[in-house]
Amino acid sequence: KMSDNVIFAEQRKRDEEARLAEAAKEAEAKRVTLNKYIARYIAEVEAGERQTDKGTKYSPNTIKSIKQALTQFEEFQKSKKKRYDFNDIDMKFYQDYTAWLRKKNYAINSIGKCIKQLKVIMFASESEGYHHNSLWKDKRFKGTRVDIDSIYLTKEDLEKFQSVDMTKLSPGHEIARDIFMVGVWTAQRVSDYNNIGRDDIQTLTIRSIVDEPDPENAGKTIAKIVTREVTVINIRQKKTGAKVAIPCSSDLKRILEKYNFQMPHLEDQVINRYIKDIGKAAGLTEIVNIVKTNGGEEKEVPTEKYKLIHTHTARRTGATLMYLSGMDVYDIIKITGHTSPVMLRKYIKADELEVVEKITEKYKYFD
């Protein structure tokens, strides 16, 4: 009987161990790991269930950026043959991950985006109670960003750009140029200026009082009410959700009228390809020294200007030309949608000489 009891006790022990092992296995399967959280996070963002701090859905471009950054994290794990979890995200991980990205010749800003997005994931998951790791909050665990050498087109460049004989190019080139010029005159992102239609455009009647010479009393004036019509484009920016109203210049209005106030749409990649062709045909071939950062190393690369033109050049050009015209920066940000003059200044690409010309024209102090 003693023997039987021992056997039964041992069997019960084995059964209990098996039960606990199975329970632990089930618990592990149910446990939310970092990678499971990332998959769910992306799914919720795409479905619109997880929104921005402003309570708006993430734009398609932002979703694309999030997925690209987190794809690199997945590739890194494959290269290391390891699945990283919440508690693995520390300075050792940071050093290994950034070194791996540099080895792949990623630019500093691209590396910064990967780190920034991972920090967003760590913050969200911590606030939702999935971990208590705070090692990723080390001040050295950061996504570095550097200003990129981006170009803008001067007034002279734009005149050449718009004077190109389009009969020597395809109809698509002309459409791409018109869409790009809408971007210049509105200073909006391509996601906004490449989708302008009749519903975005309105005509306002503005009344103002002006003083005119009094025909019956020499040397005196009389007040007169005058009216004028202004065409305005109203946009809710896709990236930020900000509402902006852009008065249409005569140049912009001519383009809108050409398409009966319903601009055609082209894919961004197509616009980028076509406007480079037009830039080359316009003779925008001056050499621009661009500093490129790859793998943590800076290199100065001489590049013909037309090769640097892309959809975002329109927004930079528009903001810069507004600034050089003497427009107040606070009025400019009402049009561009930037949150502050500091953010706007990152877009202004005027060189030192142009800024000096602007200042000396505006202020008598320098006479």
List each language-model region with its residue ranges:
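Short, basic (Lys/Arg/His-rich) helix/loop patches that form interaction surfaces
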Residues: 168-169, 261-265, 276-334
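N-terminal helical hairpins
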Residues: 1-57, 62
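Short, basic/aromatic-rich helical patch in the C-terminal catalytic core of site-specific tyrosine
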Residues: 94, 118, 122, 181, ...
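N-terminal core-binding DNA-recognition domain of tyrosine recombinases/integrases
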Residues: 43-61, 70-149, 164-168, 261
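Basic, alpha-helical nucleic-acid-contacting "clamp/cap" segments
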Residues: 160-164, 204-281
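Short, charged phosphate-coordinating catalytic segments
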Residues: 123-134, 183-223
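Basic, Lys/Arg- and aromatic-enriched nucleic-acid-binding interface segment
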Residues: 108, 112, 131, 135-190, ...
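Catalytic-site neighborhood detector that most strongly recognizes the C-terminal catalytic loop/helix
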Residues: 152, 222, 237-240, 329, ...
